[in-house]
C-alpha cells in the first residue's frame, strides 16, 4: 500500500512539474512591450501594428500621453520599454537637459508642421507686425524658423545650426513679425480655434487630435524633403538590441504600416522610409 502511495505522490509531482514547465514555456513565447505614445497618430499606428506583433509573439501595451515631457520621464523610470512621440532634435535636447541615456531605435514617420490662420489665406497676406504663436518647446523653434525662412518671411544668420536656431538668430524680418512662444504644444489648436494671434504653428499630431486636417487647413506646410524631424522609437541605451524592440521597429517600418500611414493620414503624416 505504501508503495502505491509513493508512486501516486511521485506521479503528482511529475505532473505538477510538467505543468510548470508548460507555463514557463508559454511565458517565454509571449513577450510584452509597453510603449508610450501620443494619441494621434502614434497610438493609432501602434494599434495597427498590434496584431502583426502578436503573430510574432509580442504583446503590445500602449500608454498614451498628452504632453511632451512625461513620456521621457516614464521611459527613464522604466515604466515603459520604449516611447514613440518625439523627433530626433527633441530627443537630443531632452537628453542634454535631463541627462537621459536614450538612443534612437529607428525612424518611423514625419509630421510636417503647419501654419494655421483664421484671418489670412496665405503667408503673403500676413500684415506688418503680425503675431506668430508657436509652442514653448525650444526644440521646435529652429524647425519653425527654418520653414519661415524657406517661405521668405525671415532670414537667419549665416552658419547657424537650423535645428537649434532661435528668434535671436533672425537677421532679417521685413514684416516685423512678432513671435510668442509661451504656449504648450497641445494647446495650440485651441489657440487657433479661439482666433488668437495672426498665425499659429501647430504640429500635425496635435492638429489631428483636435480634428483639424493638416493636409488642407494650414495656409502653409513644412516641406518633408530632407526633413530631420523624423518621429522615432526611443529606448534606454542598450535596449535597442533587444529582439522585441528590433521587431517593433521592423513592423512599424514595414510596407503594411507604411501603406496604412499613407492611406489614413493622406499626406498629413509621411512614412520616414518614403
What residues fall within each predicted segment?
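Alpha-to-beta junction loops
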Residues: 76-86, 130, 153, 175-177, ...
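Periplasmic-binding protein-like
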Residues: 107-117, 142-149, 208-250, 252-274
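Short helix-initiation/N-cap motifs at beta->coil->alpha
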Residues: 63-73, 161-190
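C-terminal motif of bacterial Sec signal peptides marking the signal peptidase cleavage site
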Residues: 15-19
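A conserved helix-loop-strand patch within extracytoplasmic ligand-binding domains
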Residues: 105-154, 258
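Short, polar/charged alpha-helical segment
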Residues: 39-61, 70, 74
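Short, well-ordered beta-strand elements
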Residues: 28-40, 58-64, 131-132
Amino acid at each position: 500500500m505504501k508503495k502505491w502511495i509513493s508512486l501516486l505522490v511521485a506521479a503528482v509531482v511529475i505532473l505538477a512539474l510538467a505543468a510548470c514547465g508548460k507555463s514557463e514555456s508559454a511565458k517565454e513565447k509571449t513577450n510584452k512591450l509597453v510603449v508610450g505614445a501620443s494619441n494621434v497618430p502614434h497610438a493609432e499606428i501602434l494599434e495597427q501594428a498590434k496584431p502583426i506583433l502578436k503573430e510574432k509573439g509580442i504583446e503590445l501595451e500602449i500608454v498614451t500621453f498628452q504632453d511632451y515631457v512625461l513620456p521621457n520621464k516614464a521611459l527613464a523610470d522604466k515604466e515603459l520599454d520604449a516611447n514613440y512621440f518625439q523627433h530626433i532634435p527633441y530627443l537630443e535636447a531632452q537628453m542634454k537637459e535631463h541627462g537621459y541615456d536614450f538612443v534612437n531605435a529607428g525612424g518611423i514617420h514625419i509630421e510636417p508642421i503647419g501654419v494655421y490662420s483664421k484671418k489670412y489665406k496665405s503667408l503673403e497676406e500676413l500684415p506688418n507686425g503680425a503675431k506668430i504663436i508657436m509652442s514653448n518647446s525650444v526644440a521646435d523653434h529652429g524647425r519653425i524658423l527654418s520653414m519661415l525662412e524657406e517661405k521668405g518671411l525671415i532670414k537667419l544668420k549665416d552658419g547657424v545650426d537650423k535645428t537649434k536656431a532661435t528668434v535671436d538668430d533672425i537677421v532679417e524680418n521685413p514684416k516685423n513679425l512678432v513671435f510668442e512662444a509661451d504656449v504648450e504644444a497641445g494647446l495650440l489648436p485651441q489657440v487657433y480655434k479661439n482666433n488668437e494671434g495672426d498665425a499659429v504653428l501647430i504640429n500635425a499630431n496635435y492638429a489631428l487630435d483636435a480634428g483639424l486636417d493638416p493636409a488642407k487647413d494650414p495656409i502653409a506646410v513644412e516641406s518633408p524633403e530632407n526633413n530631420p524631424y523624423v518621429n522615432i522609437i526611443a529606448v534606454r541605451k542598450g535596449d535597442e538590441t533587444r529582439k522585441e524592440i528590433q521587431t517593433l521597429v521592423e513592423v512599424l517600418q514595414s510596407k503594411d504600416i507604411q501603406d496604412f500611414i499613407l492611406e489614413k493620414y493622406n499626406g498629413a503624416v509621411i512614412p520616414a522610409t518614403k
